[in-house]
C-alpha cells in the first residue's frame, strides 16, 4: 500500500486487509510525505499488528515511483496491491491466490465496483475488459488495486523505467509479455471515488446515442492536432518498453507493430495503423464491440480516436 494524505479512509482499508481469510505474511506501507495524520494512524495499527512495515519517503516520489519502490521491498512470493481508501471483500486474497495457482498465471486481477459517499458522478462499468498487450499499449485497463501477482514480475520489469507512465500499466504489460494474465470475474473491491483521489476523473456519458456519438467524434477530431504529438511520444515510450522483452509472442509482435506505427504521425503510417487496428478490432477497445460494422468503423478511426487518451 502506498499512502499520501489518506487519514480519512485508511482505517477501513487496513481493517479489510488485516481481516482477510487468507493469512497475510507482511503489509508494506510506503508513505509519500503525508501532511495529515496518515503516518500516525499506521503507527497505531503497528502496535497491535507486527506484520505491518512502514516506510516514509524523505522526498516525494509521486504515485508511480512510490509504488514501484514499495513493491521492490516485498519479500513474499505473491504480492497484492492496495490503494489507501478502498475496501476489500474479506475473501479477496484467498480467491485470487486460489485462481492464480489454478491457472498457473503470473498475474490475476478481479473486478472492482466504484462507490462514493460524496455527491459526485460515477462511471460504473462491470464489463470484463480486454487485457491483452494490444489493449494495454493504449491504456492501463488493469488497475493496481485489483492485482495479485507473482513477486518475480517485479524483478522482470524492464530497465527502461517509464517514470511518467502508470505503474500498473507497466506491471500488466510485463506480466503479459512473460506469461499468463487471468481475470477472476468477481467484484472483490469496493473502489472509493472522491474528489481528492489521484485517479478521479469526472465521467462522460457513455450511452450510445446519436448526440453522444457526434459529440465524441467532434471532440476527437477537433483535439487531434493538439493530441497527436502526445500520442506519438507515448507510443515511442511504449515501443521502446516492448522491445525489452525477449519473447516474441504473436500478441507482443502485434503490439510492437502497432505502437511503432502510432509513434509516427505521417499519413501513410496512419493508414497502415488503421488497417492493423481493423485486423485487431476485437482486442484494442476496452471491451469487444458486438456490432461488427461499428467495430470496423471504430477501428479504422482508432489512430485518431485514441488520441483522446493523451489529452491534457
Short names for language-model regions:
Residues 79:
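Short aromatic/hydrophobic "clamp" motif used to bind/position activated sugar donors
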Residues 164-165, 170, 177, 181, ...:
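C-terminal subregions of glycosyltransferases and related glycan-biosynthesis enzymes
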Residues 57-74:
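Glycine-rich, basic loop-to-helix element that forms the pyrophosphate-binding segment
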Residues 91-122:
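Conserved donor NDP-sugar-binding/catalytic core segment of glycosyltransferases
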Residues 18-29, 37, 49-53:
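Short loop->beta transition adjacent to catalytic acidic/histidine clusters or analogous donor-positioning motifs
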Residues 31-40, 59:
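A conserved acidic beta->alpha catalytic loop
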Amino acid at each position: 500500500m502506498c499512502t499520501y494524505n489518506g487519514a480519512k479512509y485508511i482505517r477501513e482499508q487496513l481493517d479489510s486487509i488485516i481481516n482477510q481469510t487468507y493469512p497475510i505474511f507482511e503489509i508494506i506501507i510506503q508513505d509519500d510525505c503525508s501532511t495529515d495524520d496518515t503516518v500516525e494512524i499506521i503507527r497505531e495499527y503497528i502496535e497491535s499488528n507486527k506484520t505491518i512495515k512502514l516506510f516514509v519517503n524523505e522526498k516525494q516520489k509521486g504515485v508511480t515511483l512510490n509504488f514501484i519502490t514499495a513493491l521492490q521491498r516485498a519479500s513474499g512470493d505473491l504480492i497484492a496491491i492496495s490503494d489507501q481508501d478502498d475496501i476489500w471483500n474479506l475473501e479477496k486474497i484467498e480467491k485470487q491466490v486460489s485462481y492464480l495457482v489454478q491457472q498457473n498465471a503470473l498475474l490475476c486481477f478481479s473486478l472492482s465496483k466504484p462507490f462514493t459517499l460524496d455527491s459526485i458522478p460515477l462511471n460504473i462499468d462491470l464489463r470484463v475488459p480486454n487485457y491483452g498487450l494490444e489493449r494495454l499499449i493504449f491504456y492501463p485497463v488493469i488497475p493496481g488495486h485489483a492485482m495479485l501477482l507473482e513477486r518475480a514480475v517485479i524483478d522482470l520489469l524492464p530497465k527502461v523505467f517509464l517514470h511518467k507512465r502508470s505503474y500498473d500499466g507497466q506491471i500488466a504489460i510485463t506480466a503479459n509479455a512473460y506469461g499468463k494474465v487471468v481475470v477472476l470475474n468477481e467484484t472483490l473491491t469496493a473502489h472509493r471515488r472522491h474528489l481528492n483521489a489521484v485517479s478521479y476523473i469526472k465521467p462522460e456519458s457513455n450511452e450510445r446515442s446519436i448526440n453522444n456519438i457526434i459529440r465524441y467524434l467532434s471532440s476527437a477530431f477537433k483535439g487531434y492536432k493538439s493530441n497527436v504529438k502526445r500520442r506519438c511520444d507515448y507510443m515511442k515510450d511504449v515501443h521502446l518498453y516492448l522491445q525489452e522483452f525477449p519473447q516474441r509472442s504473436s500478441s507482443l509482435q502485434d503490439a510492437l507493430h502497432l505502437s511503432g506505427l502510432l509513434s509516427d504521425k505521417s499519413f501513410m503510417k496512419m493508414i497502415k495503423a488503421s488497417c492493423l487496428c481493423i485486423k485487431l478490432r476485437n482486442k484494442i477497445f476496452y471491451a469487444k464491440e458486438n456490432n461488427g460494422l461499428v467495430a470496423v468503423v471504430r477501428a479504422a478511426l482508432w489512430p485518431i480516436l485514441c488520441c483522446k487518451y493523451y489529452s491534457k
